[in-house]
Amino acid sequence: MLRERLNDDMRTALKAREAGKSRLSVLRLALAAVKNREIDLRRELTDDEVVDVLAREVRSRQDVLPDYERGGRADLVEKMREEIRWLQEYLPRQATPEEIEAAVRAQIEASGAQGMRDIGKVMGPVMQAMRGKADGRLVQETAKRLLGG
């Protein structure tokens, strides 16, 4: 479903003659990333897996933003932010830090996690429940903070 939506949107962008526009290039890059993952796995991806690929693309762009900002490359910062906005249209609504903290607290309570040694009991179920809706690093930071790490 999501892969077809990406293809349809790319066709629409092509027909609208958006050849030089960033949206078309972002859609092409996203579809290439999805296709590469399908080649690696030798099968078609599920929607959840496509979301994972797109989230990875967003994360990679977010990771380079601080470098571009430190380098004074306002043009590249704006380009990356625009690409992130385009990609986020295809991702589920992201959980707020408060929602993440509530989920982590609930899992700590449910699992009886006591400290950092029990972080696995918390991270696995929370990440499964928030798949595609929360950045793993933010969930991990929250879990560490709440577990006293």
Regions found by a protein language model. Give the residues of each.
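Residues that recognize and position ribonucleotide moieties
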Residues: 120
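Key DNA-contact positions within bacterial/archaeal DNA-binding proteins
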Residues: 137
